[in-house]
Amino acid sequence: MARVKRGVTSHAKHKKVLKAAKGFYGRRKNTIRTAKAAVDRSKQYAYRDRKVNKRNFRALWIQRINAAVREFGLTYGRFIDGLNKAGIEVDRKVLSDMAIHEPEAFGALVSAAKKALEYLKEAGTANEFEGAVK
């Protein structure tokens, strides 16, 4: 059986790791042992931060919606409650975008939410009202 020399394979693996470590500080970019550890850690950070990014954006959308809704005399929680009771299903990303770029349409949603809240307060029930969009 012929002897298998692994030089080519090792070189390719090392090259792949060092390419991923390009731009790192100090020895982390050119010493294979430290570069491998740094690249592994960077992948862990990237995985974690893809999840954190989603949280951060949702928080940003909520802050924007809250700021826009307060101009109409509502709080974020009451606004979302009103939308749910009115049967309007719009996600927070779209609401945030509407608040910034289409204030008239956003105002219409706020008035629909207010109307639903007032109707249910007058009726004294927590059920959906007749004007709900299905």
Swiss-Prot record:
Disulfide-bonded cysteine pairs: these are none
Please give the Gene Ontology molecular function terms for this protein. Answer: rRNA binding; structural constituent of ribosome
Enumerate the UniProt keywords alphabetically: Ribonucleoprotein, Ribosomal protein, RNA-binding, rRNA-binding
Instruction: Supply the InterPro entries for this chain.
Output: Ribosomal_bL20 (IPR005813), RIBOSOMAL_L20_CS (IPR049946), Ribosomal_protein_bL20_C (IPR035566)
Pfam families, per the entry: Ribosomal_L20 (PF00453)
Write down the Gene3D superfamilies for this protein, in alphabetical order: 6.10.160.10, Ribosomal protein L20
Query: Which positions are tagged coiled coil?
Result: none
GO cellular component terms, A-Z: ribonucleoprotein complex; ribosome
**Mind listing the GO biological process terms from this record?**
ribosomal large subunit assembly; translation
Q: Which family does it belong to?
A: Belongs to the bacterial ribosomal protein bL20 family.
The role this protein plays is:
Binds directly to 23S ribosomal RNA and is necessary for the in vitro assembly process of the 50S ribosomal subunit. It is not involved in the protein synthesizing functions of that subunit.
Task: Indicate what this protein is called per its UniProt record.
Answer: Large ribosomal subunit protein bL20
Query: Which organism is this protein's natural source?
Result: Rhizobium johnstonii (strain DSM 114642 / LMG 32736 / 3841)
Per the UniProt record, the lineage of the source organism begins with:
Bacteria, Pseudomonadati, Pseudomonadota, Alphaproteobacteria, Hyphomicrobiales
